[in-house]
Amino acid sequence: MQQKSDNVVSHYVFEAPVRIWHWLTVLCMAVLMVTGYFIGKPLPSVSGEATYLFYMGYIRLIHFSAGMVFTVVLLMRIYWAFVGNRYSRELFIVPVWRKSWWQGVWYEIRWYLFLAKRPSADIGHNPIAQAAMFGYFLMSVFMIITGFALYSEHSQYAIFAPFRYVVEFFYWTGGNSMDIHSWHRLGMWLIGAFVIGHVYMALREDIMSDDTVISTMVNGYRSHKFGKISNKERS
């Protein structure tokens, strides 16, 4: 879907399920990172009746619940990649075999380093954002696997039983569940670094380019002003 007004053209990029996934993921990640930090570095122990001092228990419950919601919305996002528009699939298929894609990567690097005068005219994600989001999805899967592996150690539900093989794999390699915890926590910091870069790039594009970025994830439309560099000019 495309709309034109004066010298501005708008494309319907992000469908409602994609936008809902994005904002639910933002909420889940905020909850998971805060509660996960305190699980790794618990609050000081206090004596007394656990009924009134069950703070860490509530923190763990919130963390586990947010993790399950995070998993469900990610599965829904993967499903929508099959039934949604072309932009819903671009984050899962990075065309590294295309010369034009690498030309786009190089041009975006120059743009972010203030060496290019004009931004590119990407309707969906630019090549660097596409690669970064693909890496984020891989990290999300890693966090889900390691998180449920840790949860499976004290869960009696059969649905989590397959994740015990992850724990057994770490024991087989000479490690233990603490190693899983360390990798899971490292993943948290890596995702935190990704979030910082993601927010910076979104704000930067909204301010410095003629594209709408933040509002696109609200209403689904990306607007461009004419006169920007095209993909052909990158070469």
Swiss-Prot record:
Family statement: Belongs to the HupC/HyaC/HydC family.
Q: How does it sit in the membrane?
A: Multi-pass membrane protein
TM helices/strands, residue ranges:
20-40, 64-84, 131-151, 186-203
- Identification of the protein by name: Probable Ni/Fe-hydrogenase 1 B-type cytochrome subunit
Gene Ontology molecular function: electron transfer activity; heme binding; hydrogenase (acceptor) activity; iron ion binding
**Where found in the cell?**
Cell inner membrane
Topological domain (Periplasmic) residues are 41-63, 152-185
| Signal peptide extent | none
Q: Does the keyword Aminoacyl-tRNA synthetase apply?
A: no
Cytoplasmic topological domain residue ranges: 1-19, 85-130, 204-235
Q: Which gene encodes it?
A: hyaC
What is one GO biological process annotated to this record?
anaerobic respiration
Output the Pfam families linked to this UniProt entry: Ni_hydr_CYTB
Against InterPro entries, the record matches this protein to: Cyt_b561_bac/Ni-Hgenase, Di-haem_cyt_TM, Hydrogenase_cytochrome, Ni-dep_Hydgase_cyt-B
Q: Name one GO cellular component term.
A: periplasmic side of plasma membrane
Q: Source organism's superkingdom?
A: Bacteria
User: What the protein does?
Assistant: Probable b-type cytochrome.
Principal subcellular localisation of the protein: membrane
Keywords linked to the UniProt accession: Cell inner membrane, Cell membrane, Electron transport, Heme, Iron, Membrane, Metal-binding, Transmembrane, Transmembrane helix, Transport
